[in-house]
Amino acid sequence: MELFDVYKRWNIEPVSGRGSILWDKEGTEYLDLYGGHAVISIGHGHPHYVSAVSGQLVQLGFYSNAVRNHLQETLAEKLGRISGYDDYRLFLCNSGAEANENALKLASFHTGRSKVLAFRGAFHGRTGGAVAVTDNPSIRSPFNATPNVTFVPLDDTAAVERELSGGEYAAVIIEGIQGVAGIRIPSDTFLQELRSLCDRTGTALILDEVQSGYGRTGRFFAHQWAGIRADLVTVAKGMAGGIPIGGVLVSPSFEASYGLLGTTFGGNHIACAAAIAVLEVIEGEDLLGHAERLGKWFREQLDGDPALKEFRGRGLMIGLEVKPEFEGLRERLLHEKHIFTGASGARVIRLLPALNLRWQGARQFVDAWKDLTKA
């Protein structure tokens, strides 16, 4: 059997990592400023994380949700306290797409409605409901297509108000920052108006913080810069250092009942041990503060750079839109400077490094950028 060929891969195979450094099987060293799509939030091989996961594996790796698992309760308590959502409840699953699926389902159960409002440029996942609210027809099969989803432009309050005025929508779903679209940030004012419109029309507000959450922007959730709270918040990527996990933070106004949601693997012992360790490192090492400081430094160094059309981002969720003549810069950073970055289209380089990226690594990137873009 061969692999089903759906991934465009670099011909590089990392075999070990420490902090923000990776080594391939030839021993070549790389600076990792992408973290496997914002997953590696505390760096590769953090000692506290390794100890927690290996220790749990020796004890018990998995049992289903047919029994009590105190690690789930510990994770919920820590996540609630650190995120500022301590009065909410946590449903654990296995990925960001699954978290969004369950959030959409909860919103529909809660409101008795079926329609969902989403935004141009949105990416919420590749499974049934999640891909239906993703603004990319090329990955939406006929099976996933539905008349129940409407897309409107980001930051267009009037368009949202027109759609919600009829009281037909179960939910509005929005990313804290649009990642795949190229680091597009909804304005604080727009998020505040969105919250107000949802309240007025009885519509659930879902904040997809799968990529933009877990401290990446310098706040635990990106939407907290706007001073709002969502009814449902979805999380996944930065939660557990690469061990599959996802979650939905659920408002107290939503009623739980046995069988309403469910999962076999969600909230298993290994995933919870990993997620608890990640939160302990984030809190213990003040990684929210570090992410905010380092993000400001990147902006000071690169905003206005001759190669840049626009610098976008908050904290360590950064989009560098280059001018047309620098379209191949990401590949040059990888092959000439051995620096992993992400992309959104041909001209946006995405930086999603570990939240504990050292200043030395940040300077290494800026020096490499300047060297490759100098006249």
Residue ranges of each PLM-predicted region?
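Conserved N-terminal phosphate-binding loop of PLP-dependent enzymes in the Aspartate aminotransferase
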Residues: 1-375
